[in-house]
């Protein structure tokens, strides 16, 4: 009898151990899992956020410190700088005041010789009382309120140039279609170049450019028509870099043109016009005008 009871007790103990081992392999019940995680976790509310509600942390912003910091590029329009040799600054100071007031009404963007512009002006003889012209800027001249710029385009095989006054009240909009520079400060030689270098679609769409991006320089060199030209562009006094002289002139003609060179002017320090102090004073006037 005792042996039977002992055998039954051993069998029950073995069955209990096997059941406990199998139980550890099974996943825990939901009640146990909830009992374990119920303490530290807060229930998320579906309604409006409360002051003590949980908010996810913001996404980290990764900055590349190896990349150099881009400084803000400032552009001072050339007509603000008075010509050299003028001793009475009052006239130019009064003109700059009027120019800054005009710029509050009309946005005059940054552009250079070689940029493609679209200008809208008031025209009493046009059907819509306005007219538009698109072309490449071939020259900027004048100082103060008398600043001008020339746009050129070839329309139906005919070269058309219009000289606009920058601060003319009839100018309603100046749009930069393509901002770029050229190798030269004046592109008047396009009058003697092939028409393809002055032909632009009047329906061109403006190109988007980042504000702090450097202005690209177009290193295009044009091909000229056969002589005669309007001026002797090959002579050193023009200092032209954007013409393929090797395609239109012989070596003898180039040597003849070099006779007009004046290499000593490069070392003449009196010809340099230092405008750093003038530009600093003009920038102060511009900042004061923006605050007013």
Swiss-Prot record:
Q: Where in the cell is it found?
A: Mitochondrion
InterPro entries, A to Z: Ribosomal_bL19, Ribosomal_bL19_sf, Translation_prot_SH3-like_sf
Where does it mainly reside? mitochondrion
Membrane-spanning ranges: none
GO MF assignments: structural constituent of ribosome
Query: What are the record keywords, sorted?
Result: Mitochondrion, Phosphoprotein, Ribonucleoprotein, Ribosomal protein, Transit peptide
What GO CC annotations are associated with the protein? mitochondrial large ribosomal subunit; nucleus
Keyword Transcription regulation on this protein? no
List, in alphabetical order, the GO biological process terms annotated in this UniProt record.
translation
Q: Does the keyword Phosphoprotein apply?
A: yes
Q: Mind telling me which Pfam families this protein's record contains?
A: Ribosomal_L19
Give positions of region: Disordered.
Answer: 40-61
Provide the positions where the record notes the PTM Phosphoserine. Answer: 77
Cross-referenced Gene3D superfamilies: 2.30.30.790
**Signal peptide location:** none
Q: Subunit structure of this entry?
A: Component of the mitochondrial ribosome large subunit (39S) which comprises a 16S rRNA and about 50 distinct proteins.
Q: Provide the family line.
A: Belongs to the bacterial ribosomal protein bL19 family.
Please give the name of this protein. Answer: Large ribosomal subunit protein bL19m
Q: Native species of this protein?
A: Pongo abelii
- What lineage is this protein's organism placed in? Eukaryota, Metazoa, Chordata, Craniata, Vertebrata
């Amino acid at each position: 009898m005792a042996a039977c009871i002992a055998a039954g007790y051993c069998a029950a103990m073995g069955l209990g151990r096997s059941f406990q081992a199998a139980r550890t392999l099974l996943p825990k019940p939901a009640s146990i899992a909830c009992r374990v995680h119920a303490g530290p976790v807060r229930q998320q509310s579906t309604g409006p956020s409360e002051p003590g509600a949980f908010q996810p942390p913001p996404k980290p912003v990764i900055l590349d410190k190896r990349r150099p910091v881009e400084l803000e590029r400032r552009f001072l329009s050339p007509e603000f700088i008075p010509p050299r040799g003028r001793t009475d600054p009052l006239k130019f100071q009064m003109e700059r005041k009027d120019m800054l007031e005009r710029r509050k009404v009309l946005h005059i963007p940054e552009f250079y010789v070689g940029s493609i512009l679209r200008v809208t002006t008031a025209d009493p003889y046009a059907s819509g009382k306005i007219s538009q012209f698109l072309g490449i800027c071939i020259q900027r001249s004048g100082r103060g309120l008398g600043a001008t710029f020339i746009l050129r385009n070839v329309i139906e095989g005919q070269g058309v140039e219009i000289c606009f006054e920058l601060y003319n009240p009839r100018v309603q909009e100046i749009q930069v279609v393509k901002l770029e520079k050229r190798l030269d400060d004046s592109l008047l030689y396009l009058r003697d170049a092939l028409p393809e270098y002055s032909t632009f679609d009047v329906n061109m769409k403006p190109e988007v450019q980042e504000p702090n991006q450097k202005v690209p320089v177009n290193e295009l060199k044009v091909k000229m028509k056969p002589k005669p030209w309007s001026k002797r562009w090959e002579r050193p006094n023009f200092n032209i870099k954007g013409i393929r002289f090797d395609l239109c002139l012989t070596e003898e003609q180039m040597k003849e043109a070099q006779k007009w060179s004046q290499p000593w002017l490069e070392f003449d320090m009196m010809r340099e016009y230092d405008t750093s102090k003038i530009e600093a004073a003009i920038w102060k006037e511009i900042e004061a005008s923006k605050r007013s």
